[in-house]
Structure formats: structure tokens, C-alpha cells
């Protein structure tokens, strides 16, 4: 699964366009975070113990949630309407009816501690990540005290992070990834285009020195330990897909065969083959103690790191347990799971409809009926006083986004220069603008963007809607003529824009902060140009061979660079007060009428 990360990275690296360096971020981060969290839990190296002291459960389909441990002890029953997190470090989180997380003590009284949080994650370490409304990412202790806050690294704001894995939490800063320890110290500097926990005390990443490198054979994967020390690098070209996780210093990888299919093998941290890829191995599902579960494309078996088949592929599925045992799914008319040893000795005659192995020597299984039971490593049922209709290993949020916007850092990332912004200028041709906008859309797009000339018939503008680090805005380029040939025989016209504009919306991180954004933009423009005229909520400066304009109507902030009639613009129309019908980025017709009304003339982009 994690091979997707590097596939996305390569697609990004192979695309060259006029985009500022710090604006390039992989938008797939959230999905990959979830994928890796799932991999870490369901198919990890099986060495770590569960951090869960109690697990959320409910006795009925629509019942309230309580907590139970794997010994069958019930902490609370029928207490919470909304699914809480696991109990770890004697604390858990549950959402209130307003949708905010609250932290509680793990006892019969379940006393609330701390504040209300927009986001919260379980105590994987002695501190847990939380986000209060309008604030940056904090890490709190079990008493709700903030131990440290993620601010910036070398002046660049930290915009997101994940919960801890192997003692480190990966964060994103200026489009690059690094990692902190449980004290908030930066252990891995944000120098990586991609960074993932690879389990077994190791992390894998791709250094930003490879940004823009087209030749796959020249890109290397970096292996780091939890102190941030680089252990090794090996060529990305050595594998085609499927970098997974380390176990016993071995990494499962896939390489494309001559038939176009991926086949799996094992390498060490230096990239040396421990077990060469084999047509017998179409996927690797889990590793433990020098062995791994594999699939031949149809059935699953067990193999050791030397390539010896210990269990031939004959089961529909196999899962490691936490006690050096296996759950296997027989492929017969009514498939059932059974618990066996690695030598295929049956531990219990009972068979199960569903199984959910956890770290340790007890597991959730479902027999006939709707309820789950807990069994031990001998297959014996653990007695409980409640029915378990549903249980959860919910760890809360796994991706945390700062709700604090550092305006200085954000405006720096707009790359406002004397002759343009966001890497765009008035000398670029239509095709260049399309390439730049297309790339931005792939990274941060929040609408439909077309890079096909046929989509721009009779059009003299190009625009793209973006959500960058939870800031919503639209970029547009306006032209004096049609951007595409009427016949489409030659594609895009060979003309340059007369104006570039950005429209910021009163949504997400900017909600309620447009006045501050306007002030910050005005301050920036005064540094790059000469003031032509100014009011409290608007400004025009001469810069390069054109003009910058910024203005706020209270509903949006408009930032333009281009050739327009400054005398025709009435800055007093920009009052910073929302006295018009509220519009969003989905209401472009209303926006157009409004722009015409404030005399920015027909060339003004909005």
C-alpha cells in the first residue's frame, strides 16, 4: 500500500511547471496517513504491545458505548452516545453533541479533564496531540496541560502532524516532512518530500534534494532510525511499487515483472536483496519472527525469510495473532476461521465467522449470531458479564491540522514579487498557465479544472479553485483575447495574460480573519511597489511594469497583479464590511456582477 506514496511522488517529480518551491505539497497525505495507521495496526511486525488499556464497545446495535478490556472486565457500560477512543494512559476522548472532543479520566466517574478540542488523538505516548478551535496543534499531558505547541521550524509554520509511531510524530512544514519526539524536539528535520514510519524503529523518506528529478534511477530512498540518523540510502529504481514496513531489519518490497505484474521480495535497510522477488509471491500480508504471510495471487501461505515455504498457499486468508499463532480462513462452501499453530496444529476445534486479532494473547472473534466474544491463545472463551455487539480500536484523529494561520508565513508562500506572484507572471503563455494551474489542481484542487483546449472556446480567462493548507482561494489569469484557437487546430493561443488574480474566501482558516489578511497583504505590497492610492481596506501600488491591487469587501479579499486602469477603480467601494449577499467560491455569477459594480473594469479577475 505504501508504494502508492512513492508512485505519487514520482508523478509529482516528473511534472515540471512554474510553481513556487514552498507551495508544492502532497495532498494525499491524509489518505496515506490512514493507510499507514491501518497497516501499523492490522499487519505490523507484531512486536509491539497494544497501548489500549480498555476498548470501546456497545451491547446493542443502537446502544451507547462503554469500555471493556481483554480480560472481560467492564469499566463503563452504556455511557456515551458517540464512539469514544480507546483508553490509554488512563485517559480517553469522546465527542460531545457539538462535535468537540472531550478528555475523560478512565474510571467509574469518567471526569472531564482539559478543554474542548476540534481534534484529538489517543495517548500513544505520555502526551497526546489536540487542536483547539482557532489555535495551533498542542500536545497535552493526561491532566490537560499543554506540554508543547507546534509553531514553526526556522520561521516556517508547521501546518499538520500525525500521532506517534515508534516514538516519533511526523509533521509537515512548508511542504516538507520531518518528525518530532514526545518532548517536541525536532528529531528529523523537515527536509523530506515524503516521510513514513516503516515500523521496527525505522522511517523511510525521499529527501527534497530529489525534487524535480525526472530520472527515477537517480532518486534514492532514505532509511532513518528514531534518532534521525540516516542509516542508508538505496535506489528507488530498485523497486517498482509496494514499499511496506520493516520487520527484523527486513523490508518487504515489490518489483514489476516482465508481464507487468508486481512480485514481492525482501531487502535489508541497505537495499540488498535478502529474498529476491519470486513469481510465487504476489503480495506480502504480514511479517513476524523471520516469517511472512504471502499470497500467490489466489491463496495464502506462510514462508520464512530464506524462501522456504512453511505452509503452502491453501487458505483464503491468514492473519498473525499476537501469540505466535495464526488465524486461517478455510476455502470451503461456508468459509470459517480457525486458530492454528505455525505447524498447522489446530488449537481449538471451534471455528469463527469473523476474527480480529490484537497485540497480545487474546482476540475478538465472532461465532454464530451478532455478538463478539473474547478468546485466549488456547481458544477458550474469556467470560464477560456483557454482550459485545460492536467494539472499536478508535484512536481518535490520525491527521491533525493547525487552525492557526501564521499570516507572515502564508504570505511569504504566495511569493509576491515585483513582476508577479505564485510563480506566475505576465509574460507566460497560455500553455504555461495551463500547466501551472493543472499541477496546482492536482495538489489542492477543489473543483473541476480542465487542461483541454476545447474547454476554453470563446473564453478569455483561466481559473482554478484551491484549498491550500486549509485556506480556500481561487487563482485566475485573464487575457485580452480567446485563450484557445476557435478551430482547435493549434490548441491554445500564443498569448500572455494581462492580469493575474487571487480571491480569498471567508472560509476555513480565513473565516473571520479577512481584515488581518488585508492588512498583511497591504504591508507586503508596500515593500514591492510604490503606493498609488490607499484606503483602510484597499491599496494600489505600482510594481514592475504593472500594478498590484488588494481590497476587501468583508466577504472576500481580492489580490490582483496586471494592467488595469487604476483611475477607474473606486477604492471606497471596498469597505471591509459584508453588505452584499454572501457568496462562496461556488457562486461565480454573483462574484462577476459584484466586480463589475466596483469598476475594476472588464479586465479585472476576481
Where are these regions (language model features)?
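Residue-level detector of conserved, function-critical positions
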Residues: 46-404
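Non-cytosolic coordination micro-motifs
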Residues: 377, 389, 395-465, 472-606
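Hydrophobic alpha-helical signal peptides and transmembrane signal-/tail-anchor segments
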Residues: 3-10
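C-terminal motif of bacterial Sec signal peptides marking the signal peptidase cleavage site
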Residues: 41-44
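Sec-dependent N-terminal signal peptides
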Residues: 29-39
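Positively charged n-region of N-terminal signal peptides that target proteins for export
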Residues: 21-22, 26-29
Amino acid at each position: 500500500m505504501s508504494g502508492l506514496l512513492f508512485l505519487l511522488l514520482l508523478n509529482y517529480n516528473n511534472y515540471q511547471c512554474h510553481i513556487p518551491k514552498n507551495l508544492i505539497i502532497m495532498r494525499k497525505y491524509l489518505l496515506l496517513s490512514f493507510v499507514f495507521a491501518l497497516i501499523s495496526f492490522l499487519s505490523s511486525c507484531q512486536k509491539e504491545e497494544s497501548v489500549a488499556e480498555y476498548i470501546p464497545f456497545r451491547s446493542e446495535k443502537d446502544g451507547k458505548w462503554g469500555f471493556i478490556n481483554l480480560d472481560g472486565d467492564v469499566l463503563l457500560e452504556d455511557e456515551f452516545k458517540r464512539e469514544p477512543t480507546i483508553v490509554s494512559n488512563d485517559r480517553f476522548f469522546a465527542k460531545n453533541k457539538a462535535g468537540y472532543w472531550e478528555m475523560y479520566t478512565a474510571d467509574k466517574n469518567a471526569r472531564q479533564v482539559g478543554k474542548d478540542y476540534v481534534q484529538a488523538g489517543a495517548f500513544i505516548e505520555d502526551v497526546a496531540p489536540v487542536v483547539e478551535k482557532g489555535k495551533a496543534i498542542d500536545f497535552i499531558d493526561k491532566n490537560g496541560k499543554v506540554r508543547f505547541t507546534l509553531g514553526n521550524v526556522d520561521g516556517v509554520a508547521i501546518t499538520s502532524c500525525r500521532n506517534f509511531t515508534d516514538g516519533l510524530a511526523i509533521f509537515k512544514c512548508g511542504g516538507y516532512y520531518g518528525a518530532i519526539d514526545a518532548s517536541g524536539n525536532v528529531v528529523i528535520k523537515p527536509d523530506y518530500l515524503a516521510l513514513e514510519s516503516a515500523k521496527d524503529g525505522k522511517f523511510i523518506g525521499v529527501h527534497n534534494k530529489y525534487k524535480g528529478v525526472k530520472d527515477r534511477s537517480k532518486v534514492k530512498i532514505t532509511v532513518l532510525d528514531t534518532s534521525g540518523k540516516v542509516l542508508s540510502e538505496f535506489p528507488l529504481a530498485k523497486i517498482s511499487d509496494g514499499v511496506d514496513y520493516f520487520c527484523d531489519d527486513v523490508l518487504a518490497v515489490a518489483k514489476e515483472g516482465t508481464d507487468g505484474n508486481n512480485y514481492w521480495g525482501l531487502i535489508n535497510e541497505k537495499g540488498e536483496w535478502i529474498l529476491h522477488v519470486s513469481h510465487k509471491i504476489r503480495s506480502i500480508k504480514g511479517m513476524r519472527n523471520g516469517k511472512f504471510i504471502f499470497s500467490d495471487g489466489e491463496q495464502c501461505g506462510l514462508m520464512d525469510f530464506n524462501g522456504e515455504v512453511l505452509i503452502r498457499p491453501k487458505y483464503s486468508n491468514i492473519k498473525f495473532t499476537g501469540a505466535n499463532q495464526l488465524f486461517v480462513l478455510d476455502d470451503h462452501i461456508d468459509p470459517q476461521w480457525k486458530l492454528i499453530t505455525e505447524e498447522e496444529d489446530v488449537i481449538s476445534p471451534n471455528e469463527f465467522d469473523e476474527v480480529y486479532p490484537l497485540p497480545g494473547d487474546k482476540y475478538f472473534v465472532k461465532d454464530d449470531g451478532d455478538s463478539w466474544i473474547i478468546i485466549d491463545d488456547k481458544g477458550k472463551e474469556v467470560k464477560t458479564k456483557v454482550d459485545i455487539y460492536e467494539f472499536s480500536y478508535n484512536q481518535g484523529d490520525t491527521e491533525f491540522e493547525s487552525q492557526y494561520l501564521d499570516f507572515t508565513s502564508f504570505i511569504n508562500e504566495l511569493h509576491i514579487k515585483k513582476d508577479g506572484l505564485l510563480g506566475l507572471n505576465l509574460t507566460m503563455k497560455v500553455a504555461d498557465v495551463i500547466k501551472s494551474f493543472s499541477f496546482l489542481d492536482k495538489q489542492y484542487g477543489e473543483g473541476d479544472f480542465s487542461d483541454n483546449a476545447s474547454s476554453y472556446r470563446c473564453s478569455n480567462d483561466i481559473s482554478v479553485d484551491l484549498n491550500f493548507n486549509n485556506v480556500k482561494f481561487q487563482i485566475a489569469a485573464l487575457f485580452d483575447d480567446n485563450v484557445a484557437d476557435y478551430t482547435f487546430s493549434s490548441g491554445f493561443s500564443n498569448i500572455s495574460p494581462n492580469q493575474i488574480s487571487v480571491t480569498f474566501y471567508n472560509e476555513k482558516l480565513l473565516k473571520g480573519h479577512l481584515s488581518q489578511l488585508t492588512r498583511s497583504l497591504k504591508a507586503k505590497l508596500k515593500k514591492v511597489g510604490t503606493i498609488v492610492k490607499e484606503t483602510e481596506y484597499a491599496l494600489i501600488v505600482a510594481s514592475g511594469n504593472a500594478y498590484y491591487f488588494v481590497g476587501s469587501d468583508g466577504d472576500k479579499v481580492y489580490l490582483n497583479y496586471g494592467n488595469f486602469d487604476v483611475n477607474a477603480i473606486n477604492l471606497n467601494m471596498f469597505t471591509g464590511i459584508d453588505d452584499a449577499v454572501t457568496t462562496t467560491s461556488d457562486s461565480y455569477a454573483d462574484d462577476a456582477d459584484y466586480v463589475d459594480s466596483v469598476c475594476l473594469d472588464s479586465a479585472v479577475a476576481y
